[in-house]
Amino acid sequence: TIINVKCTSPKQCSKPCKELYGSSAGAKCMNGKCKCYNN
């Protein structure tokens, strides 16, 4: 799921993804936006 959070690295996406989808959520930075996924 791509969320409306700007990023330059996956580390910036980890916290918002975990807040939205729970502590097991993964995070990537794609095209300047965060992408969250459940493993």
Swiss-Prot record:
Chief location bin: secreted
GO MF entries: ion channel inhibitor activity; potassium channel regulator activity; toxin activity
Intrachain disulfide bonds: C7-C29, C13-C34, C17-C36
GO cellular component terms, A-Z: extracellular region
Modified positions (Asparagine amide) in chain numbering: N39
Sequence segments annotated as region (Interaction with Ca(2+)-activated K(+) channels): 26-34
Compartments it resides in: Secreted
Expression sites by tissue: Expressed by the venom gland.
Record carries keyword Hydrolase: no
Family: Belongs to the short scorpion toxin superfamily. Potassium channel inhibitor family. Alpha-KTx 02 subfamily.
Domain notes: Has the structural arrangement of an alpha-helix connected to a beta-sheet by disulfide bonds (CSalpha/beta).
Protein name: Potassium channel toxin alpha-KTx 2.1
